[in-house]
Amino acid sequence: MKKNVKKNVEKKEISITVKDLHIRYRGLKKFSIKKSLLKMKTGRFEIFEALKGVSFEVEKGKILGIVGKNGSGKSTMLRSIAGIFCPDEGSIDLHGHTISLLSIGVGFQPALTGYENIILSGMLLGFSEDQIKEKLNDIIEFSELGDFIYSPVKTYSSGMYSKLAFSITAILETDIMLIDEVLSVGDIQFKAKSYAKMKELINDENRTVVIVSHSTETLRELCDEILWLHEGEIKMKGDCDEVLDKYQEFMDAIAAKREEDKKKEEEEVKKAIKAQEKKSA
């Protein structure tokens, strides 16, 4: 599939600078009821480092894709850029007037209606009430929510939530867009419409986009570069095809090892059953 790569920006201008970023959580690396109760009793929790000295830049007008297996720090990275998480060490510098994060479960007040959340979200993105009201009907129409726009967001399905979140960002058009798997949610018709709108938005050479997705096909088509995160660190960054090919090899190896371990476990169970049957005979 041919990539939708933007034209080169004449002068290199940096939109996002991440330098030696560390993000830490207090919690349990591996959950167990016994450990959890013990930590609650003693008041001591382990420190889990979600991001470990991550540094990279994104040029203005470029599209960066982020990949990595579950728990590698992808969503933490986006939330840090969006300002939801503060760095424990390091820094994040943004060179854009407005920034938006598209992610299921982030950004809306559940008790408020979809309509009210449009106003609130727009203000949080840095737009004036007049600017939001100018685009209000377009946002509602694009969302396809109809009268549900006047219902509390807590009553929405994940697909409805995704439609509203995407519509707000797509119509208000921020300078920096952060997208966390949101294009994978919703009905087929809306997916096609939102994907077409996304391609239109990212073709603007003044807009910088960072996308987290498990779809390597989508990333190959849309992105200029790929950042591969592994256990909170950068494993590789560079050309889309080169990085994604290496990443796919890595994931295939993990899947093959998992399948091999499963077969070994099944064989051990069969042997144990046969041994028990022989003993009982």
Map each language-model feature to its residues.
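H-loop/switch region of ABC-family ATPase nucleotide-binding domains
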Residues: 213-214
